[in-house]
Each structure stands twice: as structure tokens, then as C-alpha cells.
């Protein structure tokens, strides 16, 4: 098989990326029921630099503009005492010696606050964005990169993990956990559960108190019961082929996410054009 050497995202050492070949198809009990050939779309060039660029652009374009109120820190009646009093010439509340409103005073306005007019997004060429997505898709078929990203799974599994369409008919989370355990990937969900911690900084007061590691990426052909049964497990993302992008395939710009795909979803992905 053709081989190409590339640099890892977070390490100086080199890894060998091979051309993907045949993959096993697993049932809900983890048994191999057949083989399938990985689509040609998985054999595109692996470019970690473009993957990072694509993820950065996607995340930047998600940002919402923010700014303080235009009148923040200025809701006072103030005046200055002027010179000759032996005190600083700052604005003070009327009838009081308390300084106010100036940026250097407690409770005053900010000197140069963020503006809602500022464009926080980043531009990227369409072809470059597509190349980043396909490169991240290619990385999911490389066991070396998946392991380097920290995912835990049975050594005998072929990646990406292809499962029969019966997976989409699972009706409960309990059944989903049993299936993931049988296939040999539930250890990665446990890694996400054990890695849950309280976020450092102000974010924990703003609706994002906990930081949870990214675990399995589940790709289903359509909105289904199977997808709903696993999406509440820590670290798991459930998407359809149309919703795949570089950000979900390589969270944080680190390629090699552990991916579980139904047979129907794989057929849809195989129909993509480069």
C-alpha cells in the first residue's frame, strides 16, 4: 500500500499514514458479519495544517458578537473640581468626592470595550474548507492517528468502525451501551466520563461549567432512534453525513477522531465528490 509520512499535530515525531483498504462490518454483538471496501473519498491527501485552518475558521464563524451597553459606567451625573485642590482632576459624582465614569475609576466605563461591529469570523477558500473536511475524514481511517488522539478501543477493530444498519433501530440508551460494549468502544465513553472536570475561569459561571473530553463520533444515515439513544452519553456526538465538517471530525484541530458509521451512512459518504 502507498505510504506517506506526515507530522503529528501535537508531537515532533513522524507517523506513517497508509492508504485505507478493507474494513470489517460489525453487528450489535460485536461479531464480524462481513467486509466492505472503504470509499475512495477516504484516500485523499492528509494535510494536518489545512485541517487546523478549517477548524479555526469554523469555530471563529460560530462566535457571537458581544459588547457592553453603550451607557455602561456612564449612568451618573458628574463634574470635575478642576485644579488647585490638591486632588486628582477626575470626574466626581455631583455633591460627593467619589470619583466616577472615567476609565481609571472604580465603576467607570471601559476605555476601549469590544464592539458588536467587529467581524469575529475568519475567511477560508471553499476548496480549502472541503480539503480540510476530507483530510479529517481520512484521518479517522488511520488507527495510528486515532490512538495518538487518546481514544481507547479494542485493538482488533478496524477504523472507522462500520456497523450494520440495525444500530439505527436501537430504542434505548441501555441497549446502546450494551452494543458499544460488545463492539469494543465503550472504554472511550468511560474515558470521557472520567475526564469530566470543572472548567477553569469565568466560563463555569456562564453555562459551561464542565469540560468533557470528546469521545465517539456516531454517523447515522438519518435522524433515528439509534442516534437519539447514544447522543446523551458523555463525549459522544451524533451527526448525519450532511452535517460532517472538519470541526466534528477533528475537534480542536486534532485529527484522528474515533468514528462509528452505519452502512447506509457510509454509502452516502462514498457518494461525495472531491
Features from the language model and the residues they span:
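Intrinsically disordered, compositionally biased charged tails
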Residues: 1-26, 32, 273-274
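Solvent-exposed alpha-helices and their adjacent loops that cap or buttress functional pockets
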Residues: 16, 153-156, 208-212, 231, ...
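Basic, glycine/proline-rich low-complexity segments that contact nucleic acids
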Residues: 28-213
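Structural motif
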Residues: 159-161, 215-218, 236-237, 257-259
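Short His-Asn-centered micro-motif
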Residues: 163-166, 219-222, 241, 261-262
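Short, solvent-exposed amphipathic alpha-helical segments in soluble enzyme
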Residues: 177-182, 231-236, 254-255, 274
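Nucleotide-binding motor/catalytic cores of P-loop/tubulin-like NTPases across gene-expression machines
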Residues: 225-248
